[in-house]
Amino acid sequence: MSSTALIHDDEALEPTLQSILDQKTLRWIFVGGKGGVGKTTTSCSLAIQLSKVRKSVLLISTDPAHNLSDAFGQKFGKEARLVDGFTNLSAMEIDPNGSIQDLLASGGEAQEDPLAGLGMGGMMQDLAFSIPGVDEAMSFAEVLKQVKSLSYEVIVFDTAPTGHTLRFLQFPTVLEKALAKLSQLSSQFGPMLNSILGSRGGLPGGQNLDDLMSKMESLRETISEVNTQFKNPDMTTFVCVCIAEFLSLYETERMIQELTSYGIDTHAIVVNQLLFPKKDNPCEQCNARRKMQKKYLEQIEELYEDFNVVRMPLLVEEVRGKEKLEKFSEMLVKPYVPPE
């Protein structure tokens, strides 16, 4: 590649995300890191570059802050929508804390709880919420089910800050627990509850416990299948985004170790907000900050010598809107060369 000529060390990995664009088998790409390091800008820019080499790209935000709309200057929701100015790039914003009742209703109108008035109001929700993480797990499973039915060639996830990023790895276990609890409930009280539910109009959407069990099993199968794909380096990779500061580097190392323990491929780090002051720059603060950044950059290069480490400059203006995102995205595939 042309940018390889810019690398003085022949053995150094290319400091770009070009390898991700070249890997045509990739289906899932996660972009994650500490809050405020430029995850959304990076994921939007990566999706833009992917749209140049792939037939169809879907960008999904699972961050409750939902910055995709702000980044593109266009409102997105829980349904995939084409990004203005593109024919093969769509985006959607999902709430990972979507309610269990909405899922059970399968998109239908909210109905009065059939168990209300029997001293059992909200019982199904209480049961579900008693399992840690099940709400997010089912919401995520539902989204994956939607995504599977759509024909996107590659899906980019703009994830929530680090602490929540890796929850999807626990979803199969969470859903197994939920299924076991519901199975136990169904076997013990199924006939009685179905009888009560029948007299009260059933669960939302006219479902009974058997329908609920079937839905849970279907979601579990979907999650299990996708989880297998997540652990296949030919199909899935994780792009870490950070800044050259101690806390961000610490979070990145913790995240990479956790990804490795789960068998998730990661081989790229984007370091944002780097300063490149000129040698005769009189700004003491700029030079001091650059000195600090240089120290952590050296640590990153030493720790992750087998990673593609992309160095991105701190810009004088916000990266918002299609044109600025496209300009920023070019630096993900062509190494930034600071002015002399």
UniProtKB/Swiss-Prot annotation:
Catalytic residues, per the record, are 63
One Pfam match = ArsA_ATPase
Query: EC number(s) for this protein?
Result: 3.6.-.-
* Record keywords: ATP-binding, Cytoplasm, Endoplasmic reticulum, Hydrolase, Metal-binding, Nucleotide-binding, Transport, Zinc
Query: What CDD domains does the record point to?
Result: ArsA
The Swiss-Prot or TrEMBL record annotates one GO molecular function as:
metal ion binding
Where is ATP bound in this sequence?
Answer: 34-41, 245, 272
Task: Name a single GO cellular component.
Answer: GET complex
Per UniProt, where does Zn(2+) bind? 283, 286
The record describes the protein's role as:
ATPase required for the post-translational delivery of tail-anchored (TA) proteins to the endoplasmic reticulum. Recognizes and selectively binds the transmembrane domain of TA proteins in the cytosol. This complex then targets to the endoplasmic reticulum by membrane-bound receptors, where the tail-anchored protein is released for insertion. This process is regulated by ATP binding and hydrolysis. ATP binding drives the homodimer towards the closed dimer state, facilitating recognition of newly synthesized TA membrane proteins. ATP hydrolysis is required for insertion.
Subunit description? Homodimer.
Family that this chain belongs to:
Belongs to the arsA ATPase family.
* Protein name as it appears in the record: ATPase get3
Question: Species name for this entry?
Answer: Talaromyces marneffei (strain ATCC 18224 / CBS 334.59 / QM 7333) (Penicillium marneffei)
